[in-house]
C-alpha cells in the first residue's frame, strides 16, 4: 500500500483558473485531493497530486485538474478518479498506476460511462476483475481493471422498491461473495417511508449472478452505506460484516433510527440480534441528554 494518507482539503475562496504546464501529479507517497470552491459553494475546481510529506504548504502547480469534488479511490497501486455530477462532468472513470520506485502517477487509461449515473467506487474481486456499481442506473459493471474495458453487467433494477434503481451503494467481498447494500431511496435522496429496512444483494463473484437479496426488517434501520464512503461497510476481527445505516440523517424527528446491521461470518443472512440502533445511546463524555440522532 503506497497511500500513507489520503487527504481532502476544501478551500473556501473564489479564484481565477490556473493554467499549469502539463501537470503530472507531482511526486511522493501522500495522495492529496484539494477542492477550491466558488462563492456559491456548489461549483469550483478540484486537484489531485502526490506530495513527499504533509508538513508545510503546497500549491496546485503540479496537480492534475479534476471535476469539482470528483471522488477518488485507491486500490492496490491503482488510483481511480470518478466523474462528478452536472453538465461540466467528464463522463469517464480514469485509472492511474502508482510507480512505487519513482513515486509518480503513470499510465492513465479511461473508460467512458453514461452521464449522471454516479459510478463512485470500484471493488476488486479477482486479479483483473472489478465491480463498479452505478448508483442511479441500477446496474453493476464488470470491468477489466487493467484495460478499463467493460466485460459484462449485473442488472439490479428488478430489485428496486419503486423507481428504476435500488441505488447500489458500497459493497464488500467475503468468501467469494460480493455483499452490495441497496440504499432504496426516493427522489429526495431519503429512505421511503413505507420501506424502512436494509437490503443487500449477495452476488457470486465467479458467476457474476445475484444469488439472493437479503433484508433486515426488524430494526427499521435503512440507507445502508453511502456510495462514496468505503468505511461504512467492514469486517471485524471475527470476519463478521457490519454495515452502517444512516436512515434520515437525523433530519426527521419521527424517524431517528440509525446504526449497524450484521452478517456474521459463515452466514449469508442477517443476524438481527447483532443489529444496533444507536439513536438512544448516549455518547460517553457528552452531556447525558445528547444522542447520536
Residue ranges and their predicted role:
Residues 11-14:
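C-terminal motif of bacterial Sec signal peptides marking the signal peptidase cleavage site
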Residues 243-247, 251-293:
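Long, well-ordered mid-to-C-terminal structural blocks that present hydrophobic/aromatic surfaces
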Residues 36, 179-197, 242-259:
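Short, conserved, GDST-rich strand-edge loop motifs in beta-rich repeat architectures
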Residues 17-114, 118-148:
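Acidic/polar, low-complexity intrinsically disordered N-terminal segments immediately downstream
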Residues 45-51, 95-97, 144, 193-208, ...:
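Beta-propeller blade signature
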Residues 106-115, 154-166, 210-228, 269-291:
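Surface-exposed loop and turn segments in beta-propeller and other repeat-based domains
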Residues 161-224, 237:
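Solenoidal tandem-repeat scaffolds enriched in leucines and small polar residues
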Amino acid at each position: 500500500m503506497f497511500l500513507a494518507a489520503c487527504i481532502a482539503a476544501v478551500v473556501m475562496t473564489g479564484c481565477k483558473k490556473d493554467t499549469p504546464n502539463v501537470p503530472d501529479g507531482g511526486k511522493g507517497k501522500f495522495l492529496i485531493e484539494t477542492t477550491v470552491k466558488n462563492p456559491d459553494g456548489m461549483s469550483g475546481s478540484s486537484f489531485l497530486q502526490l506530495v513527499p510529506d504533509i508538513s508545510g504548504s503546497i500549491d496546485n502547480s503540479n496537480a492534475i485538474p479534476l471535476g469539482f469534488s470528483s471522488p477518488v479511490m485507491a486500490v492496490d497501486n491503482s488510483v481511480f478518479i470518478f466523474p462528478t455530477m452536472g453538465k461540466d462532468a467528464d463522463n469517464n472513470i480514469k485509472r492511474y498506476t502508482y510507480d512505487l520506485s519513482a513515486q509518480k502517477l503513470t499510465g492513465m487509461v479511461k473508460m467512458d460511462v453514461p452521464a449522471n449515473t454516479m459510478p463512485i467506487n470500484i471493488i476488486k474481486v479477482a486479479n483483473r476483475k472489478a465491480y463498479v456499481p452505478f448508483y442511479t442506473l441500477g446496474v453493476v459493471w464488470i470491468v477489466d481493471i487493467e484495460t478499463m474495458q467493460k466485460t459484462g453487467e449485473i442488472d439490479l433494477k428488478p430489485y428496486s422498491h419503486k423507481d428504476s434503481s435500488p441505488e447500489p451503494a458500497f459493497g464488500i467481498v467475503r468468501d467469494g461473495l460480493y455483499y452490495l447494500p441497496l440504499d432504496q431511496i426516493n427522489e429526495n435522496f431519503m429512505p421511503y417511508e413505507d420501506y424502512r429496512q436494509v437490503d443487500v444483494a449477495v452476488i457470486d463473484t465467479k458467476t457474476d449472478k445475484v444469488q439472493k437479496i437479503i433484508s433486515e426488517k426488524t430494526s427499521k434501520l435503512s440507507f445502508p452505506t453511502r456510495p462514496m464512503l468505503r468505511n461504512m461497510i467492514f469486517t471485524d476481527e471475527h470476519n463478521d460484516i457490519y454495515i452502517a445505516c444512516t436512515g434520515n440523517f437525523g433530519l426527521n424527528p419521527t424517524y431517528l433510527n440509525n446504526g449497524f446491521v450484521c452478517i456474521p461470518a459463515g452466514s449469508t443472512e442477517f443476524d438481527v440480534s447483532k443489529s444496533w440502533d444507536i439513536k438512544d445511546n448516549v455518547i460517553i463524555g457528552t452531556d447525558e441528554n445528547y444522542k447520536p440522532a
